[in-house]
Amino acid sequence: MMTRLCADDPARLRAVLAGLRRYQAAPPAPPRTMRPEIARIGSVSLKDHGGSGPPVVVIPSLINPAHVLDLAPDNSLLAGLVARGLNPLLVDWGETAPLGIEQLIAERLVPVIAGLGQPVALAGYCLGGTLALAAAALLGPQVSRVALLATPWNFAGYDAARPRLADWWARTEPLATQLGVLPIELLQPAFWALDEAGVVAKYAR
């Protein structure tokens, strides 16, 4: 992809590859602080990130690990919520059993939130926002409000990427079927296909 998009600009390709090497050589993230688990249903758990204010159930994407919202003390959405007087409770999907989206919401997410037995706000990131909306509809008055962060809502906006996505899936589906899962290494190119120029620009900086 990078060589294709930079075919007419060797200097830009060199900059992109240099940026990619810097990314690959970056030091690993610091060890994460283990958070207490306050609820669990199957593979889905709630982790308490502290704070004494109103509870906010934070729902990450199914694709990213939960700690993407708590990368480091100085780079943490959850630490920011605590600093603002809230009590963030992070949903950790764990190694999710082979459930459909409807089952995951109705049999895992909704019961683990309902078990708190008190009104909560929901904050959903990316696909987690879509799941938060469904959970809020099922939980009714227990949910006081919903905040959505980077949640997809206009799926008609990717017409230019559809041929690339169709080609990616035609090559990926047989392997995913054989594995029984879709590993992130196979899924990542689908995200790249949505904005190839943006991926190149990120590494060219």
Language-model features: where?
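Alpha/beta-hydrolase-fold enzymes
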Residues: 1, 117, 133-205
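N-terminal targeting or regulatory segments adjacent to alpha/beta-hydrolase or S9 domains
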Residues: 1-29
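A structural boundary/capping signal
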Residues: 3-4, 49, 102, 120, ...
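Short, surface-exposed "cap/lid" segments of acyl-processing enzymes
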Residues: 26-94
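A structural signal for isolated positions on well-ordered beta-strands in alpha/beta enzyme cores
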Residues: 89, 121, 145-147
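The conserved SAM/SAH-binding core of class I Rossmann-like methyltransferase domains
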Residues: 91, 125, 149
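Catalytic nucleophile-loop/oxyanion-hole region of alpha/beta-hydrolase
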Residues: 94-119
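Gly/Ala-rich beta-loop-alpha elbow adjacent to hydrolase catalytic centers
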Residues: 123-128, 132
